[in-house]
Amino acid sequence: MPVKKITKEEILLKSSDVFRVKGYHNTSMQDLAEASGLLKGSLYYHFPSKEMLMKDLLISIHKYLTDSIFPIANDESILPEERMEKLLKKMGKLLLEKEGGCLIGNTTLETVGVVPEFQEVLQAIMNDWTAALKTIFETRKNSELSFRLAQQTIMEFEGAVMFSKLYNDRQFLYDAFARTMVKLN
């Protein structure tokens, strides 16, 4: 049988679904190889360890967010309310459209203090998300308050995703979104 050609990006995409559902520690290289349609040895050719694969996945997610979602905060062609709505809806879609929870939140909870290689990129993601929201809040609030509101929004949003998944009810996320819009004004 011919060897299947697959790119690193495709492996990362398929692996994200496995990590999202099974978590970091409960996912094996065999699970990731099967999800990618590869033999385990072929997966090791691309990624020498599960840690390297996850770190590359987190870096890839960070790049996607900083290239495609966080820049919405700086789009002065639309009102701050529209920026906030657009940014949060895109994040909500990312977090709810697939089985499992928030890969960033889950990986943070599962690996902080255990797999230190991930902490820097996880912090960078949260810092950039905070900065994006702060930019929007600063259109109406002072810098210090905007920073606190941005962090509070992320904490509430992550909790709302968890409740939405647990109770199979997206209203938790809709309510968090509505409260954020009130905080903006």
Give short role names for the model-derived ranges.
Residues 82, 86, 114-140:
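Amphipathic alpha-helical packing segments from all-alpha helical-bundle domains
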